[in-house]
């Protein structure tokens, strides 16, 4: 049995086992589908460099992981940092934002161990019709399938 990617999925890197794991993860997270990447770094870089478009706005916590920062840097979207876990500052920025708004946070911040206020973030995202993107890399496993699933908030997020 092959382990890991043997190349790009288009050419030779897709396998039945990969698709089984994706189906399993989608089921466990109660979402329509899941997509595996070779690492969390490539997942964040790929997402933020390709999904938000010119005219959109990405609002990211100032303590967000480097992989998100790198993906955001490659994006054509407008980029704004908000103070760490400061929901009032985030709301002030959302009021002035344009296009589709993406709020980027980590559920468990890798550098200092802080938790994102996920319930408050879901309410703010709903209020401003924003898309909340949660990096669960440091919570997955330690908190089961992550804090989003543990708090039963998975239907309010685009990416985990």
Regions found by a protein language model. Give the residues of each.
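Short, structured coil segments at secondary-structure junctions
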Residues: 54, 74-76, 128, 156
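Conserved PLP-anchoring active-site segment centered on the Schiff-base-forming lysine
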Residues: 47-66
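Conserved N-terminal alpha-helix of the aminotransferase class I/II PLP-enzyme fold
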Residues: 2-39
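SF2 helicase catalytic motif II
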Residues: 130-144
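Active-site phosphate-binding strand-loop segment of PLP-dependent enzymes
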Residues: 80, 84-134
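Short, small-residue-enriched loops and turns at beta-alpha junctions
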Residues: 10-14, 66, 87-88, 108-112, ...
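Conserved active-site segment immediately N-terminal to the catalytic lysine
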Residues: 129, 148-160
